[in-house]
A protein has these predicted regions:
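Short linear sequence motif anchored by a di-proline
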Residues: 1-90
Length: 90
């Protein structure tokens, strides 16, 4: 699975999760607060089994589902990634 992040300064980072650390895969990954993120299965796989733990605690007041149009307006340089990760969203 690959995690795609857009930080508050607009930097896009892709992190590949997996067991092969010699191929720079990571077995776990931390996404910082305030970062937009999404993920997709790697080539050759059709799904990923994922868990997401939040700390110190989760409050829906702090949650915001990304809007395709708003994200593209804010980060037009990442149009292709945003479009792929927000399929089916307005």
């Amino acid at each position: 699975m690959t995690v795609v992040e857009i930080s508050t300064d607009g930097t896009l980072t892709k992190t590949t999760l997996g067991q092969d650390v010699l191929q720079e895969q990571k077995v776990q990954h931390l996404v910082k607060a305030g970062t937009w993120f999404g993920s997709f299965p790697n080539n050759g796989t059709t799904y990923s089994f994922v868990g997401c733990t939040v700390a110190p605690g989760f409050d829906f007041c702090d949650f915001q589902l990304g809007s395709r149009s708003k994200l593209i307006d804010e980060y037009p340089q990442h149009f292709k990634d945003i479009e792929m990760l927000t399929e089916g969203l307005p």
